[in-house]
């Protein structure tokens, strides 16, 4: 389970690029299994980047612990650590931005787990462990049947003549 609980919420008013609708948000007691996370660290002037002294999701120490978990004898170069931290920050920023757009599309001023979950499932083919996807049905492209292929071949053949 993650540190935010099963259904974390983030108020979109803390993001400068997302302008929430003036709709009122429901009181916290009315939403089952929800907790408010609060504002995300980072200022609009820094491009939303988190400075090392703020609460980063992935720090150098956490990255080193992860590497030791995979191979206790492995040591990353400083440049590699910086690059991996940058990639992680960029990934998180892009996911949060897309999830905020989904929340705005729902006409909500609150970012919910289902927004992040939908983006990760559709764009990255990732599932968040511990979160059910009853509300989000799997998105699968329809496979083409043999009959359809034959019809399309016939259409192509007749249009070439």
Swiss-Prot record:
Highest taxon listed in the record's lineage: Eukaryota
InterPro entries: Histone-fold (IPR009072), TAF12 (IPR037794), TFIID_TAF12_dom (IPR003228)
Position of the Glycyl lysine isopeptide (Lys-Gly) (interchain with G-Cter in SUMO2) cross-link: 19
GO molecular function annotations of the record: DNA binding; DNA-binding transcription factor binding; protein heterodimerization activity; RNA polymerase II general transcription initiation factor activity; transcription coactivator activity
Cellular component annotations (GO), alphabetically ordered: nucleus; SAGA complex; transcription factor TFIID complex; transcription factor TFTC complex
Chain residue ranges for the region called Disordered: 1-56
Compositionally skewed regions (Polar residues) per UniProt: 1-17, 26-37
Single Gene Ontology BP annotation: regulation of RNA splicing
Limits of the Histone-fold domain: 56-128
Cell location: Nucleus
Keywords: Isopeptide bond, Nucleus, Phosphoprotein, Transcription, Transcription regulation, Ubl conjugation
Residues where Phosphothreonine is found: 43, 59
Family membership noted in the UniProt record: Belongs to the TAF12 family.
Function: The TFIID basal transcription factor complex plays a major role in the initiation of RNA polymerase II (Pol II)-dependent transcription. TFIID recognizes and binds promoters with or without a TATA box via its subunit TBP, a TATA-box-binding protein, and promotes assembly of the pre-initiation complex (PIC). The TFIID complex consists of TBP and TBP-associated factors (TAFs), including TAF1, TAF2, TAF3, TAF4, TAF5, TAF6, TAF7, TAF8, TAF9, TAF10, TAF11, TAF12 and TAF13.
Protein name: Transcription initiation factor TFIID subunit 12
Gene name of this polypeptide: Taf12
